[in-house]
Amino acid sequence: MLRVAVPNKGSLSEAASAMLSEAGYRQRRDTRELVMVDPDNDIEFFFLRPRDIAVYVGRGTLDVGITGRDLLLDAEVEAEELLPLGFAASTFRFAGPVGDFTKVEELEGKRLATSYDGLLRGYLAERGINAKVVRLDGAVESSVRLGVADAIADVVETGNTLKAAGMEIFGEPILKSEAVLIRRTGQEGAANGTAKEIEVLIRRLQGVLVARQYVLMDYDIRKELVEQAAALTPGLESPTVSPLRDSDWVAVRSMVPKKETNRIMDELYDLGARAILVSSIHACRI
């Protein structure tokens, strides 16, 4: 049975469970549940603190897990990223009092507060910057005002909290993060017979990602305009073209990027396409 770690709370939790549900896996109904078995898919879910998931997976206690890329790298364990999942996007950035810093090199000899000391130490070492890292469990933006640090390194989503604390971002992003599926480094599942289950899980999650990014578009077009229409709707490989009762017309079906739906519909209509319909994709295998 495949053993999977899932975030039990925070910004990762709800989105991870929703994605797994879309992929056809049973999920808990009560947030107090710590373990849940899905016998139909021969899989067991363990709901854990997001920060601990990489540790469990890295030690081989659990087969795979969903966590943030930032948390994976900060844990400094033998675990690797299998698949980016497209949600919980954020950046890990430096920030300091407005006007105090403009570039990373100015952090030499300074005190830096962070909740991601492993990730930060690695970044500073790579660049030869000597700074004192002060580890805090949260609310690091208050550390400068309280005299604990000169600047901070933290995960930033909107930046509003930093602005409210009188701070500004400087330097390039330390890391661009999002939710990721992880497994133990070098472990392909052969040791405990879960290789096939992991492959199926990845394929299902990839299907959800594609289904979220694309829609299915159907339309009718005159035969002589098919090539021009196909240039607008090339699909992932090629559009499906089917004959209609009127031999001068054909029906076309193609997957198109969801964010470009209305633009493509307008251009098809201007070209001469009619009966243009769009359908959601709930699941797919590419």
From Swiss-Prot:
Q: Which cofactor does it need?
A: Mg(2+)
Keywords for the protein's UniProt record, in alphabetical order: Amino-acid biosynthesis, ATP-binding, Cytoplasm, Glycosyltransferase, Histidine biosynthesis, Magnesium, Metal-binding, Nucleotide-binding, Transferase
Q: Could you mention a single GO BP entry for this protein?
A: L-histidine biosynthetic process
Signal peptide positions are none
Give the Gene Ontology MF terms in alphabetical order: ATP binding; ATP phosphoribosyltransferase activity; magnesium ion binding
The Enzyme Commission number assigned here is 2.4.2.17
For this record, the Gene Ontology CC terms, alphabetical, are: cytoplasm
UniProt key word Cell cycle: no
* Biological or metabolic pathway of the protein: Amino-acid biosynthesis; L-histidine biosynthesis; L-histidine from 5-phospho-alpha-D-ribose 1-diphosphate: step 1/9
Indicate how activity is controlled: Feedback inhibited by histidine.
Where is the protein localized?
A: Cytoplasm
Q: Which Pfam families match?
A: HisG, HisG_C
| Reaction(s) this enzyme catalyzes, per UniProt | 1-(5-phospho-beta-D-ribosyl)-ATP + diphosphate = 5-phospho-alpha-D-ribose 1-diphosphate + ATP
Main localisation: cytoplasm
User: Can you tell me which family this protein belongs to?
Assistant: Belongs to the ATP phosphoribosyltransferase family. Long subfamily.
* Function of the molecule: Catalyzes the condensation of ATP and 5-phosphoribose 1-diphosphate to form N'-(5'-phosphoribosyl)-ATP (PR-ATP). Has a crucial role in the pathway because the rate of histidine biosynthesis seems to be controlled primarily by regulation of HisG enzymatic activity.
UniProt name for this protein: ATP phosphoribosyltransferase
Q: Which organism is it from?
A: Arthrobacter sp. (strain FB24)
